Amino acid sequence: MSEPAPEVPEELFREVKYYAVGDIDPQVIQLLKAGKAKEVSYNALASHIISEDGDNPEVGEAREVFDLPVVKPSWVTLSVQCGALLPVNGFSPESCQIFFGLTACLSQVSSEDRSALWALVTFHGGSCQLNLNKKCTHLIVPEPKGEKYERAVKRTSIKIVTPDWVLDCVSEKRRKDEAFYHPRLIIYEEEEEEEEEGDNEEQDSQNEGSTEKSSVASSAVASPAEQPCSPKPRAEVSKGELMFDDSSDSSPEKQERSLNWAPAEAPPLNTAQRRLPQGKGPGLINLCANVPPVPGDILPPDMRGNLMAPGQNLQNSERSEILGTWSPAVRTLRNITNNADIQQINRPSNVAHILQSLSAPTKSLEQQVARGQQGHPNASAVLFGQAKGAPETHVLQQHHPPQQPQQQHPALHLQPQIMQLQQQQQQQQQQQQQPQPYPQPPSHQFPQQVHQHQFSQQQLQFPQQPLHPQQQLHRPQQQLQPFQQQHALQQQLHQLQQQQLQHHQLAQLQQQQQQQHNLLQQQQQQQQLQRLQQQQQMQNQAAHLSQASQALQHQVLPQQPLQLSLQPPPQQQQQQQLFGHDPAVEIPEESFLLGCVFAIADYPEQMSDKQLLATWKRIIQAHGGTVDPTFTSRCTHLLCASQVSSMYTQALRERKRCVTAHWLNTVLKKKKLMPPHRALHFPVAFPPGGKPCSQHIISVTGFVDNDRDDLKLMAYLAGAKYTGYLCRSNTVLICKEPSGLKYEKAKEWRIPCVNAQWLGDILLGNFEALRQVQYSRYTAFNMPDPFVPTPHLVLGLLDAWRTPVKVTAELLMGVRLPPKLKPNEVANIQPSSKRARIEDLPPPTKKLTPELTPLVLFTGFEPVQVQQYIKKLYILGGEVAECTKKCTHLIASKVTRTVKFLTAISVVKHIVTPDWLEECFKRQTFIDEQNYILRDAEAEVLFSFSLEESLKRAHVSPLFKTKYFYITPGICPSLATMKAIVECAGGKVLAKQPSFRKLMEHKQNKSLSEIILISCENDLHLCREYFARGIDVHNAEFVLTGVLTQTLDYESYKFN
């Protein structure tokens, strides 16, 4: 930053169009301008949003609405230092990041581990430093010792954690409690090394300092592969960060997507190898640069000194040579290659190991062995503590049970890499041993070691060729002088430990390959096992339902395996066996509910409108059905919303047909009694008011008309929020086809895309589907009808439909078939409303001037009545208004909250009753309106207003004059309706969501118009930043009731 302008490469930011939010350092702006960046005045036009304040609403708008990258100013400065545009990942200023606000001091960790930890913390919003001062919030230290540790203990403001706290936080995507990661809680296992400790005390004390620097003191730090490098060399981290982001989520769906990223990481591996010194692969570099790490939780510090002391001087020259030629850029490339392993700790082992084997099959011993130690501490203790063949094999078998026989061809391409790695390690050992020939240890150890190599390789199916160079390596040493045996014993112990580490690594790689094949076979067999999985899921979830529903499930489920095994296509056969009425009996279309006796449950408690329930009864009776006030044995149908009730259990036990009001609506439309065939036709499997999807915000794409309405209702019944739009806050997108803009955006934003069957299964009791959005049955979009319920979930409900509804002869005789009409009679019978519309209106008897001509609208009347009024209006010389804004008179019989009424109240001169028009027609002239003003005492008491006073206020000044409104898109009534009401009242509706800065600017400057925010329950996720800033957001009643009463009520309708 001291010389910003000259340092900026020419046209570095030529493609950058930036929009700055908040106060940005002027030097950063100068860097951007020097690199030919362009500043835009509106965030939607920008390619990058630059801000230090991640909670600013403008930042949220850019991210949610325009999907723009938001970066901190440090992205600019580091891009200049690197001479290239850095990827935007890792530079987010948002406060939702795991380590936001954290300042960590790193102590007593190796340089590579420090780089990895530094990258993890800064990538997730924190900052790191090497000095312990007042700014520090955390001290990351592997062991409870050292000067920084002693000082941090005395400060309550500094939390002390081990490095694995960072890894676990990143793995679980949340900041975990630091108390469980204090270094004092580390437990060391010393049983395996007690004998060697006494022999090497003196040498351990000499190497203690170097041990702290070169070893990894915490097992979790060495567990994952190398993380992205320290912040400075970030120019080559783009692909690594992409993999990092993709693998940072532990959800099953994103684990599967990680497989797609893995092949893209192969080229960086080759690049890294090309840039290494000749003759040295990644494994060789790590062996020379660092002694293989020993986890702090397994071995005590003195034991680690023993393990690293032999041969240490031999490695110094090699290490300095390698470190001199191995640049940070090379390490960065290697870390990019290994990035797939970041945060794999808590994942299923098969997925994690597949990623590891695909992305970096030839990783260093340091990384691979350490990762194995994370999962198998006992095995590590045995491997490091003693050079025995049988115990090692036993431990491997214990922790890695035999896998099923798999195809061998994917493993073949890995074996040459393993052999190459072995040969490189053997060459290194030869280089170390030849300058100082030490005597051979006692002969009984070497045959034992050979046996170990052979047994392990046979067990793991690895080629035994690399064994021979090792045998040749040891034979010349057998002729050395006896006085060097003690020193050689230590050196040989070190070699054996490295060999054991090597074979442990090979075992890990082989296990990864086997697990990869297992996962692939599971995916291939998934479709064949779908029905069996569904049965098991149904049995598991039966335990979570209520007692009544549980009893039902136990009655239905025992028959499922037999039916599914005996009937391969159950859905087709069931469809053939289900009946409404007997096909042999002719039922009149108008009486298609003949023989059906309904009892109604659940709905009376849920419906506030009792008139609607009475309407149902009237409609059922009009089509030949009967409604009983209680459930009796003569009932044939139970109309219910939920499976969790005693009435439902009784009805199912008596083989009654249990259906919903939605089914009734469907058969009324089709005029035919038919079995239920959609998920909405069946009662839901949870109690009324239950909300299994309460955490979901659902959007749909590809569905129109009735199908879209059905999905809205299904989402409502499941307790989910529904949005007609798609934003990053949505949790699920329900697709008809895998195409369209919403689908593409959902894939880009990693929003699960499922079919409609997913939601139907949840309604019918398969709550496991909530965690199975990635299952193939829910991601298949070529289904003929995605609303058809899963057969095994409705077996018991369909059982009653296997016999037809009985219709007695008396019932049929009581129904008179309507006489067939002649064609000319059919033509003459037309609805009166249509007849009125096509008739020519009589010419007006009087011609009035435009100023005196009433422009009238009608609301709250039947169409036939409206046509009669229009005829009289035309005779008198009046006209029907083209739109509300031009209307002078609104004719209504009562106060109604229709669009016409709520828009007209702000602009019309008079709201009158139909009596005014009738009286005008009698007198054949328009008379004074004062005696015919609409008065509705009931509505005025209900809404606590006076219609006459409201009209007077509207005439004085429009209610929303000089006011701006931002209305969220999911508002009900629709956005178009709300906009019409607001604009008629003098307000204006903003098309774009206003930023916090704009809101405050309008609030503080009295000369600017006020901005009012209107939203609804389903859109509250769009207003999170407003709530965080204490800005009021109101519901639709602020507008609807406001225009009716012509008042502004800022308190009654705001969200808390």
UniProtKB/Swiss-Prot annotation:
GO CC terms, sorted: chromosome; histone methyltransferase complex; MLL3/4 complex; nuclear matrix; nucleoplasm; nucleus
Subunit record text: Interacts with the C-terminal transactivation domain of PAX2. Forms a constitutive complex with PAGR1 independently of the MLL2/MLL3 complex. Interacts with TP53BP1 (when phosphorylated at the N-terminus by ATM). Interacts with HLTF. Component of the KMT2 family MLL2/MLL3 complex (also named ASCOM complex), at least composed of the HMTs KMT2D and/or KMT2C, the common subunits ASH2L, RBBP5, WDR5 and DPY30, and the complex type-specific subunits PAXIP1/PTIP, PAGR1, NCOA6 and KDM6A; required for the association of PAGR1 with the MLL2/MLL3 complex.
PROSITE patterns (UniProt xref): BRCT
SUPFAM superfamilies reported in the protein's UniProt record: BRCT domain
Organism name: Mus musculus
Subcellular location: Nucleus matrix; Chromosome
Identification of the protein by name: PAX-interacting protein 1
Region (Disordered): 188-276, 393-412, 419-486
